Structure formats: structure tokens, C-alpha cells
């Protein structure tokens, strides 16, 4: 894609690709049939729906392979990263009887922080892991916040404001050893640093693939 030409047309150079990215022409081309010819409901077992279902299945397999997921069925498509984060927090909290605590950091994306505020107003306890002036966190403090009432720990993989990359693999391992599910918002990490879900103890990595250049159906 030619961001230089795009910037010239709009009077500047676009440097905000971590927020959203110009659609790759190959992606536009790949999606065209599903915006015109193949418009059927993927859940319908007729001639209009079956090709769409096959395309979604293929896309799920591609994403699973890209992220190193063990099975394609582990991939859940949502409309956006915010919906994915909400799915992780709500599902973890309400599916585990007797567990009403969440461990997270004060530097998460608003999709996490605002949801935690809402859950807190409805009885959940949110334990915030301190972050230093340099954006670093303490693994020992993280471990100290985990207990038998912890439903989920959620720490972003890479911070969208500071650029800090957090030791998600180590955090997930600590959470696993305490029987706590671990979620990471990896929107800023995928396609920039190696991600292999088979090599981590991540329970859910739901809010990741939002960059338009990643998917080619």
C-alpha cells in the first residue's frame, strides 16, 4: 500500500497504523466477491450460504495457523477488539461460580478498564497491578494478587500509548500455576512480534487480529 500517496492526498503522512491501517489492495480484491456475489448467510445450508461458510472456515484455519492455535475452532471472530475484550472478561467472570475478582493493570486499553469499572459497580473486585514510571510491572506483585477467587488476569501484550511490551508468556505461566485464566489484548503485538499460542499458557487471546493486512481469504 502507498501511504505516501495517501498522505499527500490528505495533506500529510499517515503514521497512525497501530490505530488502524489502510486496507491492503490484496485484501480488497479478496473480499470483493463476499460483498457482491457471495452474500448469503453462512449458517444457511443452501447454494448462497455454503460458499460463505467455506470461506469463513478457511479464514479461521488461516488465523489459527498464523497465531499458532492448536485447533481452528479455538478462533472466535468478533466485530472488533472491544467486543473481544468484553467477551473475555464477562465470560470468565460469570462462568466461574465463587470467583469474582479480576487482576489487570491501570494502563490497559479503555475496552478493558471501562468494562472493569462496570463489573466493579456490579459486585466484582478489580485488583490493579502497579506499573512503574517507565511502564514496567512486577511479576512478584502480579503473583501476590492471584488467589482462589480470581476469575481472570488480563494484561495487554503491548501498550498502545507507550510501546511497552509486557512478559505475557511469564505472566500466563504464573496464572496457570495458580489455576487462573489469563487473557491478553494483543492488538498491538500480532504481526509485529512473534506470537505462538502453542508455546504459551494463554487461556484466551481474543482481541488480536484487527489489522486489515493480516487476513487474505
Locate each region found by the language model.
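Pyridoxal 5′-phosphate
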Residues: 1-217
Amino acid at each position: 500500500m502507498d501511504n505516501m500517496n495517501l498522505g499527500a492526498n490528505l495533506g500529510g503522512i499517515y503514521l497512525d497504523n497501530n490505530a488502524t491501517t489502510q486496507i491492503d489492495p490484496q485484501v480488497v480484491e479478496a473480499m470483493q466477491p463476499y460483498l457482491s456475489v457471495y452474500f448469503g448467510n453462512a449458517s444457511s445450508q443452501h447454494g448462497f450460504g455454503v460458499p460463505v461458510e467455506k470461506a469463513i472456515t478457511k479464514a479461521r484455519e488461516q488465523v489459527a495457523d498464523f497465531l499458532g492455535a492448536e485447533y481452528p475452532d479455538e478462533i472466535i471472530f468478533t466485530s472488533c477488539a472491544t467486543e473481544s475484550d468484553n467477551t473475555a472478561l464477562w465470560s470468565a467472570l460469570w462462568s466461574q461460580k465463587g470467583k469474582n475478582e479480576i487482576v489487570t493493570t491501570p494502563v490497559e486499553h479503555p475496552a478493558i478498564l471501562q468494562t472493569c469499572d462496570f463489573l466493579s459497580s456490579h459486585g466484582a473486585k478489580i485488583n490493579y497491578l502497579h506499573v512503574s514510571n517507565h511502564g514496567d510491572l512486577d511479576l512478584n506483585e502480579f503473583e501476590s494478587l492471584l488467589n482462589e477467587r480470581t476469575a481472570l488476569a488480563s494484561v495487554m501484550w503491548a501498550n498502545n500509548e507507550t510501546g511497552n511490551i509486557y512478559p505475557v508468556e511469564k505472566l500466563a505461566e504464573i496464572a496457570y500455576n495458580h489455576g487462573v485464566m489469563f487473557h491478553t489484548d494483543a492488538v498491538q503485538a500480532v504481526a509485529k512480534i512473534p506470537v505462538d499460542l502453542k508455546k504459551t499458557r494463554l487461556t484466551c487471546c481474543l482481541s488480536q487480529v484487527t489489522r486489515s493486512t493480516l487476513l487474505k481469504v
